[in-house]
């Protein structure tokens, strides 16, 4: 909608994303320069912090029943966490791989992200249609119908980054640059 409140909500959401995502790029540098951590540990600690931001998404829908400002603020924090996570994830490629492979590795990662995005969006759309058709017969965590579908998606997104961080930590438990011969 083009109402003044809707415009203010969207502005607030994007302002939060913009300001905090810039800070998200700085946090690993702070850990390295000010706390003396090695770059890998600093980046992984920052990524763990950003992976926790989406947990706030579990509150967006319930808090929306109190005021529309809460979801705007919470989703702004989620977006900032996502941006900071992504920036640091892509930076790990430059940290670990030789310059001659960075573009290829980044492209493979971006393609995987695009396919994952397509699948989550397609699955969400099917879930929303199903939930809407079932109406009150479809219930999840106190929400019925389509709102229950949205709550399911918020739950999936809330844990996806933590799962991703754990997978990355399992695949790369210690920093070791990859050498291509």
Name the predicted role of every residue range.
Residues 40-89:
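C-terminal transmembrane helical hairpin of 12-TM major facilitator-type secondary transporters
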Residues 12-19, 76, 107-115:
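Transmembrane alpha-helical cores of Major Facilitator Superfamily
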């Amino acid at each position: 909608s083009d109402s003044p409140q809707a415009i203010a909500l969207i502005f607030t959401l994007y302002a939060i994303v913009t300001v905090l995502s810039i800070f998200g790029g700085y946090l690993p540098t702070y850990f390295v320069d000010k706390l003396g951590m090695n770059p890998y540990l600093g980046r992984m600690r920052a990524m763990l912090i950003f992976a926790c931001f989406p947990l706030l998404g579990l509150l967006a829908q319930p808090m929306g029943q109190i005021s529309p400002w809460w979801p705007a603020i919470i989703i702004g924090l989620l977006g900032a966490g996502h941006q900071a996570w992504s920036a640091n994830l892509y930076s790990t490629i430059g940290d670990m791989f030789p310059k001659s492979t960075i573009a290829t590795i980044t492209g493979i990662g971006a393609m995987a992200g695009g396919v994952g995005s397509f699948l989550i969006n397609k699955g969400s759309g099917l879930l929303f249609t199903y939930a809407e058709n079932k109406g009150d017969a479809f219930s999840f965590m106190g929400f019925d119908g389509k709102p229950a579908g949205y709550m399911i998606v918020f739950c999936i997104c809330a844990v996806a980054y933590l799962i991703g961080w754990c997978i990355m930590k399992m695949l790369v438990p210690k920093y070791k640059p990859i050498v291509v011969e």
